[in-house]
From Swiss-Prot:
The keyword Acetylation does not apply. Belongs to the phi29likevirus protein p56 family. Homodimer. Interacts with host UDG; this interaction inhibits the uracil-DNA glycosylase. It holds the Pfam family UDG-inhib_P56. It comes from the Viruses. Inhibits the host uracil-DNA glycosylase (UDG), an enzyme which removes uracil residues from DNA by the base excision repair. Interacts with host uracil-DNA glycosylase and prevents the latter from binding to DNA. Since the viral DNA polymerase efficiently incorporates dUMP into DNA, the virus needs to prevent the deleterious effect caused by host UDG when it eliminates uracil residues present in the viral genome. Keywords: Early protein, Host-virus interaction. This is Protein p56.
Length: 130
């Protein structure tokens, strides 16, 4: 249990460091930039779901990744690196880092926030779990 908590804390520290770099990017580029965060919730042929978050992509790279995915895309969103998207970027980075240590995290996210009763793209409120 302690090992899992330490891994979780390390993941959060990694996100905080990444967000510091992104904040610097926001200060330099006040408006929209040519850099994107790609969020996908994927389902393989046996029904297992996973969350994939790719950082710092150009628009062409986003198109290439989406076009080369062989799994079923249950949810996909692209966030431009700009100040107004800061909170969404932070939440998805956090979710992607935590998912490495919690194997059912993508499925839980999908069920809670992207189910039939909810609108796709609703805001996600990730909370500390320890």
């Amino acid at each position: 249990m302690n090992k899992e908590k330490n891994s979780y804390r390390d993941a959060i520290k990694d996100v905080e460091l990444t967000m510091m770099a992104i904040d610097s990017h926001f200060r330099t580029h006040k408006g929209f930039t040519d850099s994107y965060l790609l969020v996908m919730i994927l389902e393989n042929e046996v029904g297992e779901t996973r969350l994939e978050v790719s950082e710092g992509l150009t628009f062409d790279e986003v198109g290439y990744i989406v076009g080369s995915v062989s799994d079923n895309i249950l949810h996909m969103h692209t966030y431009n690196y700009c100040e107004k998207n800061r909170e969404d970027i932070y939440k998805w980075l956090k979710a992607s880092r935590i998912e490495k240590f919690k194997s059912d995290y993508a499925k839980m996210l999908m069920n809670m926030h992207f189910g039939k009763e909810n609108n796709v793209g609703s805001n996600i409120n990730l909370k500390e779990e320890f």
